[in-house]
Amino acid sequence: MCIRDRERREQRHRDNLENGVALETVIRDYLSPKHRDRAATGCPTAALVAEIARHPKATREAFTGKMSDILALMAAQMPEATPAEQRRRAIAAYATMVGALQLSRAVSDRQLSEEILENAVDAALALAKGR
């Protein structure tokens, strides 16, 4: 059940990006306290990325394909930039988002967790906008 919920959430993020939901909305949703607090049904990337790194090449290739899809969807929402710049910004924003979500879940200090999320939203938005 847990994996299915995660897959649905990941698909919702993809659907949002494909359907033109503003990248800012996706970033804010991903880095929300609600998403942080629902680790069991949240993003599989944030939950499993360290484990995926230890898996065979075939698993990592499947992960790479899914991640590449997400990056392409994010990059497409970054107008007024070259394709290379869009990709660079998408990678930086997504890495910020995933890392911040992991850290916000790992710390025991609730205030620090909130600060991580809030600052990561600002950072990811700045990266997405090329600032």
Protein language model annotation of sequence segments:
Residues 20-23, 29, 55-59, 103:
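Alpha-helical bundle regulatory/interaction domains
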Residues 6-10:
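Generic helix N-cap/helix-start motif at coil->alpha-helix transitions
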Residues 14, 49-50, 75, 101:
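Amphipathic alpha-helical segments within well-ordered protein domains
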Residues 11-42:
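Hydrophobic alpha-helical connector segments
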Residues 57-64, 77-131:
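Hydrophobic/aromatic-rich alpha-helical bundle segments in the mid-to-C-terminal region
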Residues 1-5:
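Conserved small/polar residues in nucleotide/adenosyl-binding loops
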Residues 31-36, 45-55:
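Helix-loop "lid/cap" segments that line or gate small-molecule binding pockets
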Residues 67-77:
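Active-site oxyanion/phosphate-handling segment shared across diverse enzymes
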